[in-house]
């Protein structure tokens, strides 16, 4: 919701770079959490002594942390949370950018190609992560995460390139970057009262409920 508000308020260019930066920050935290440099640091001591009990969440059995959980896992979870916020922001931003660039053209083909390339990115992660982890004969997970950080750095650079390309497009067409009306709290009521919104939301819930658990546990199946 907040990503949509930022996108409507600030436009595609700003939100694209913001989402890329957020993803890179989250992934960098994730990488540092699994490196040897994190072991014995002050951050490790802090995570060992904190976040062992979260009132309310523990009673419901849905706490992301627990007593005895490794500090590296806690810090990596924080980084992954930040990364996930950037991912969702990037998802809607890319869709908005495609609508702008391919309006009146092969928009459906462009969106389909974008989704196909995104799935190839997931496949790349699955295929090459074990390869990087086993480089040199010594298994080190941090190398796989570092590979992801490098890819995200490249992605951020591409977002910056897109920023200038989109700005050049506006200059050529004589149009300003399209921004929606300022966000109002009443807009949430209109969205939540729409049956179409709930239908699409339910489809997304069902889809991701099937895909993400499978991705997580498929490794153990193999």
PLM regions and their residue ranges:
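Flexible cytoplasmic inter-helical loops of multi-pass small-molecule transporters
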Residues: 42-47, 163-187
